[in-house]
Design a protein with these regions (language model features):
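Conserved N-terminal entry element of GNAT/NAT acetyltransferase domains
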Residues: 1-13, 17-52
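A short helix-loop-beta-strand connector motif used in the catalytic cores of GNAT acetyltransferases and
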Residues: 86-100, 131
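Conserved beta-strand in the GNAT
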Residues: 101, 108-117
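Conserved acetyl-CoA-binding loop-helix of GNAT-fold acetyltransferases
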Residues: 134-137, 143-156, 183
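Conserved GNAT acetyl-CoA-binding A-motif
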Residues: 159-169
Length: 200
């Protein structure tokens, strides 16, 4: 169940904000329209065509996971964006993919999130599973509500795409984000154990 605090805090913007949604092939939401254009924050939505733009931030996220990982730091330091991009593209082909960029000024990406809806085969049959695949916000832009806006939009998108189950993976060492995801009703369910090979 979604925390009511999450609904009330994310359904509105910061005081004085005004929103506008451009009627184009992708959704554009502008926040803080009362400030100069070069300082304005906007949210832009697209699909796999946006993946190249998230690479620098994805690498920062991976480096952060490497710092925090107690057992599998090497798997993060050797991670390759091209491989991850292929996974995202496969999800786009097999189901649906949403990429949201938080952009400051003309073209500075302050954060991004990638989510998907794909079919999953289980003992109960086939069902649609929504997943928050990746989310990262630059440190200088945290505590501004960007993550909450990402989370709200992902939740809406999952509902629009009839996801019957919603998941996200949290790396060990990054447990501080559990409370954030709890706001959207995402709760810890299992702990995955993986054998550490000698090469890791």
């Amino acid at each position: 169940m979604i925390d009511e605090r999450f609904k009330s805090q994310t359904a509105h913007n910061l005081p004085g904000d005004e929103l506008s949604i451009a009627k184009t092939d992708r959704r554009v939401e502008t926040v803080n329209s009362n400030v100069p254009a070069d300082e304005r924050l906007k949210f832009v939505e697209g699909g796999a065509e946006f993946l190249e733009r998230i690479e620098p931030l994805w690498k920062q996220q991976t480096a952060l996971h490497a710092e925090k990982s107690a057992h599998f730091a090497e798997s993060f330091t050797t991670a390759n964006f091209s491989d991850r991009k292929r996974v995202f593209e496969q999800k786009a082909r097999a189901g649906s993919l949403l990429v949201i960029l938080a952009i400051v000024g003309p073209d500075e990406i302050a954060g991004y999130t990638v989510c998907s809806v794909c079919e999953e085969l289980s003992d109960l049959g086939t069902r649609k599973v929504g997943e928050i695949d990746s989310m990262f916000i630059l440190a200088s832009y945290r505590r501004l509500g960007i993550g909450r806006k990402f989370l709200l939009r992902c939740t809406q998108w999952f509902e629009q795409n009839h996801a019957e189950k919603v998941i996200t993976l949290v790396a060990v060492g990054n447990e501080e984000v559990l409370e954030f995801y709890r706001l959207a009703g995402l709760l810890p369910r299992a702990i995955l154990l993986e054998r550490k090979d000698q090469t890791d």
